[in-house]
């Protein structure tokens, strides 16, 4: 009883003190209880009726144990992927495919290089392209941000939206090309019997396999990529054995001069684009790894996971390309069905016949492993493009991306595959601009991960505006236009290199973007403070 009486006296004393404060103006009566109340109501309304109520599609995804998280930062409590191996195998499987194999064949078949020159270009430009992928993978571990959300910090909010749009186009476009190549290879199997797979059905098979994996999200993507390289690697070993038995491989003569230099630069641009193309995806595949994970192990795991399959498949592709130049029959298969035709020529007629066709099917299906990262990232890039689009669940965007890919790939394979290939080559140039801007921001201005306030990920008032990023992007685009060398456009500078020109579009685009960004960015910081 004495204790209760004492507490009551204290309460009365405190109430009297507050009343005197109000009378003397010590408390601000304009921003007291009412404001606190409305803030509490708004917070309650937001948490209860928006954040905590999953959408219809997210409820279905959750029931199927699929990933429901979108572009929101992954908190430390949600990080449950402690496998260093996952950081390597995601890229190991994605590049142990016929797409990378086909890129390697461009050296001898398109750019006129011999085998030795092709190998040197493959090694150097792959290393140049894979380092940014390994670097950006560290950001996912440290910050828990998706790659296109991370771009808001690295390139500015406005510029990041543009990169998100280009990334959506790139994800769909590359998957369309990959499906077209695989559908053509499937179509060649059992061609003489009249029971071969129609091209439309081949496109449907590849797209269907891709959506089955990407629908379930991060965990299933990593689980699939951990083992999908095994049959592909085995099929490539069979190609090596049959190529060796054929005796048609010859290294070719070493020739120098300006024309060869132009071929080296153009082939190098294709190789760089294949390796660096994963840079705008990288952080998406490490965001669930704990912050305490060794950054050195992550970096070198990604490097190894990219380097081996890229070196292996591209060098093998270059060897097969050299062999196709030495055999008119193989060359005719290439002219009709590109590198899928060369694979068929090596494995099937006068070779392994039925087993060779089985290997062709395996390699055609390998495209699923290459398309999976693109169709997972396309959903996140679409959400990062515009706030209302982020309200559409990831699983919906994943299915929409796969549907668009299928819808485009069927007519593209029949009618305009050449246009699609040229268009996607042009899209690839933006990678150098993106890397130049992002690396400038991190290493020159932020310098450490502590300079990133994760809570600002969707705050327009705190994120960099993107003035410097946009200026650098425009300048880089001019550099690309002057340096690119494609069948439909040869830049004024690139045409000066050799007889056919030399592609220096990514070198000029990246360097010009780097220069302009570091001229404008200090001014942006000075006048806007962010």
Swiss-Prot record:
Probable purine-cytosine permease. This is Purine-cytosine permease FCY22. One of its GO terms (molecular function) is nucleobase transmembrane transporter activity. The gene is FCY22. It holds the Pfam family Transp_cyt_pur. Belongs to the purine-cytosine permease (2.A.39) family. It is a multi-pass membrane protein. NCBIfam families: ncs1. It comes from Saccharomyces cerevisiae (strain ATCC 204508 / S288c) (Baker's yeast). Its main location: membrane. One of its GO terms (biological process) is purine-containing compound transmembrane transport.
